[in-house]
Amino acid sequence: MKAYIITIIKNSDSLDHAENCLQSIKNTDSELDAQIYLASTPESIFDVNWTWPLSGKKSCTKTNLFLTPYKTVDNKKRIAAAQSHYRLWKQCIHINEPIMILEHDALFTRKFEAPSTTDDVGA
């Protein structure tokens, strides 16, 4: 199974964590073909029409649901993290096979054995 480690390449801590993640995959003999994946950053995010409240609750005019702000120091970093995952979900669909999405600080403590899958998984 392919695995992608979301990594902020220009951040040495992120890169160090990602290398540790890769090493833990090797050390546990996990059944993963892992690689570092370039994270979206606040500087590289694509435009979004952000309608979720940054402060104070509000009612969604389309659903009548109450929207509560997500506590975050930097909303653009939160959007960038979501976009990294979104891009990988699209990659999963494009290659038409399961993938594993990992944050840079993930560590394997035992062997991961990729499950056998069929077309009806998740249906």
Regions picked out by a protein language model, each given a short descriptive name:
Residues 1-102, 106-123:
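An acidic/histidine-cluster motif and surrounding catalytic segment
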